Amino acid sequence: MKISVMAATDTGRVRDHNEDDYVALGGKESPPGVDALLVVADGMGGHAAGEVASKMTVDGIVQSLNDQREESSKLEGNALGAFLGKVLEEVNQEVWQAAQEDDKRGMGTTCTLAAIRGDQMFLAHIGDSRAYLLRDGELHQVSKDHSWVEDAVDQGVITREEARTHPNRNVITRAIGLDQQPQIDTSVMPLADGDLLLLCSDGLNSMIPDEDIHRILTSSDPEDVCQALIDAANDQGGHDNTTVVVATVGARRKAPAATQPSASDQDTQEMTITSPWWKRVVRAILRRR
């Protein structure tokens, strides 16, 4: 299946520098053994250390996949998913070691990685940068936030609505660089023709709800979606850096008739996005296997 990828990032309207980093590689640009590689890393730490952590992470992932091309190309299914988790563990060691330096102490980064091979997506994830799948017109969050508020919602301490404005909403419970032995979530799921995949930093979903993300995705031309999402986050205050990385699988999603792209636009790339309950979605997807 043909994979089209695109991405955009923005500092926002409050921060003076961008601590996000990303990878959006498809086709001949993708690392050996995969058809596309998508990564979003949202760095944290003072004195620009967050930028260092996110850049070390995305660069380390690409370098590791290139260095271990023979091993990764032979792996399939859960074995490839586990391999990607191992890659993040190795990158974590490098970031953790660098974070022991005085000027980088406390730095870290979220990391959400999606590798596509054939009709499967392999996800490795730590932190609260999200992965969303749009399938058959329905938007699903397929990653779980590693955050204080997510744990509180799971325990029934607060509601999902209260989590959006809770004082601890920016507190994450896992990240690259914080521990020598990070707990990384990995999963494998099948992809279908027409699927859309979105990875984003929390600068997007903390500013606009999933309903608005869905509306933008379904009412914008594909080549405009990344910028439209960032503009929407900035219009709501742009309190954080915002990064979106998008991939489409197979047939292009058509824009609404009123905004149909011209023939000259038909070679541009496209995108994916968001939704609520990750557990329900993963179970539903796995039942199709």
Language-model features and meaning:
Residues 1-289:
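PP2C/PPM-type serine/threonine phosphatase catalytic domain
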